[in-house]
UniProtKB/Swiss-Prot annotation:
Record-annotated EngB-type G domain positions: 22-194
Organism of this sequence: Caldanaerobacter subterraneus subsp. tengcongensis (strain DSM 15242 / JCM 11007 / NBRC 100824 / MB4)
Residues binding Mg(2+): 37, 59
Signal peptide bounds: none
Protein name according to UniProt: Probable GTP-binding protein EngB
Gene name in the database record: engB
GO-annotated cellular components: cytosol
Record's function text: Necessary for normal cell division and for the maintenance of normal septation.
Cysteine-cysteine disulfides: none
Keyword hit for Disulfide bond: no
Length: 194
């Protein structure tokens, strides 16, 4: 797939602000600071489409990016960040849950996990939710340039065992080394062909 156009459409803080069209959506979910914005920019070949921050918890609303006028990438707020108020955490959880429960156009989710970390309780909750909703998902192990090949293979095995999924649903991604991009683009392609 060639990325011809990619535009930020807007941030939604409640259901009334979601796009009203029937264009398929792919959600990007994961902990704060796992590299969601970096992945979006890298895969779409755009430098600053999604704002990258070293401060976790930067994405507060649900951000919609329209790609090739054919599908949306939906960037959900990162979860599990300790330094925000309980109130803010509740609001984020509510925003994520509302979107996941109400979107009629959600076709696939990419769950991002730092390749150097164990999956969190929140990651397991997301996987359970995907399974419950019969939503196809893939796990993207980010920051792969920080580990060697054998550590990467161990991380893949661990994810497959933890989530009871096959290795073809795990993508090893590095924005630095530009690995995993073609696999992610293939998922985008499959979604719009369905």
């Amino acid at each position: 797939m060639k990325i011809k156009t990619a535009e930020f459409v807007g941030s939604a803080f409640n259901e009334s602000q979601y796009p009203k069209d029937k264009i398929p959506q792919i959600a990007i979910v994961g902990k704060s600071n796992v590299g969601k914005s970096t992945l979006i920019n890298t895969v779409l070949g755009r430098k600053n489409l999604a704002k990258v921050s070293s401060t976790p918890g930067k994405t507060r609303g649900i951000n919609f990016y329209l790609v090739n006028r054919a599908f949306y990438i939906v960037d959900l707020p990162g979860y599990g960040y300790a330094k925000v108020s309980k109130e803010m955490k509740k609001q984020w959880a509510y925003n994520i849950e509302t979107f996941l429960n109400t979107s009629k156009n959600l076709k696939h989710a990419l769950l991002l996990i730092d390749i150097r970390r164990e999956p969190t309780e929140d990651d397991f909750m997301m996987v359970n939710w995907f399974s419950f909703k019969n939503l196809p998902f893939s796990v993207v192990l980010t920051k792969a340039d920080k580990v060697n090949k054998s550590e990467a293979n161990k991380a893949i095995e661990n994810i497959c065992r933890s989530f009871n999924i096959s290795s073809d649903r795990v993508i090893v991604f590095s924005a630095v080394e530009k690995t995993g991009i073609s696999e992610i683009l293939r998922i985008f392609e499959e979604v719009i062909e369905k």
